[in-house]
């Protein structure tokens, strides 16, 4: 008999999907199913957690020239 699972469909770029898979690799309770290269089904209660962790990861990997200028001047 088929089993139904409630989830949230996420459509994203393959690079963002890789980040979400990386987040899930440490917890194993986020991704319910990997549908294809750009779609994931994730647990409904984990949507906000994924958003927060993605924002943090993307902020860490974003170049900000103002921060570089502040470091150079010692501020």
Swiss-Prot record:
It is found in: Nucleus. Coiled coil: none annotated. Keywords: DNA damage, DNA repair, Nucleus, Transcription, Transcription regulation. One of its GO terms (cellular component) is transcription factor TFIIH holo complex. InterPro entries: TFB5-like_sf (IPR035935), TFIIH_TTDA/Tfb5 (IPR009400). One of its GO terms (biological process) is transcription initiation at RNA polymerase II promoter. SMART domains: Tbf5 (SM01395). It holds the Pfam family Tfb5. The keyword Transcription applies. Component of the general transcription and DNA repair factor IIH (TFIIH) core complex, which is involved in general and transcription-coupled nucleotide excision repair (NER) of damaged DNA and, when complexed to TFIIK, in RNA transcription by RNA polymerase II. In NER, TFIIH acts by opening DNA around the lesion to allow the excision of the damaged oligonucleotide and its replacement by a new DNA fragment. In transcription, TFIIH has an essential role in transcription initiation. Component of the 7-subunit TFIIH core complex composed of XPB/SSL2, XPD/RAD3, SSL1, TFB1, TFB2, TFB4 and TFB5, which is active in NER. The core complex associates with the 3-subunit CTD-kinase module TFIIK composed of CCL1, KIN28 and TFB3 to form the 10-subunit holoenzyme (holo-TFIIH) active in transcription. PANTHER family: GENERAL TRANSCRIPTION FACTOR IIH SUBUNIT 5. Belongs to the TFB5 family. This is General transcription and DNA repair factor IIH subunit TFB5. It comes from Yarrowia lipolytica (strain CLIB 122 / E 150) (Yeast). The lineage of its organism: Eukaryota, Fungi, Dikarya, Ascomycota, Saccharomycotina. The gene is TFB5.
């Amino acid at each position: 008999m088929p089993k139904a699972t409630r989830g949230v469909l996420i459509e994203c770029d393959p690079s963002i999907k890789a980040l979400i898979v990386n987040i899930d690799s440490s917890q194993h309770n986020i991704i319910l199913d990997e549908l294809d290269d750009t779609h994931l089904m994730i647990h409904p209660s984990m949507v906000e957690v994924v958003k927060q962790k993605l924002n943090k990861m993307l902020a860490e990997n974003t170049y900000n020239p103002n921060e570089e200028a502040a470091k150079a001047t010692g501020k």
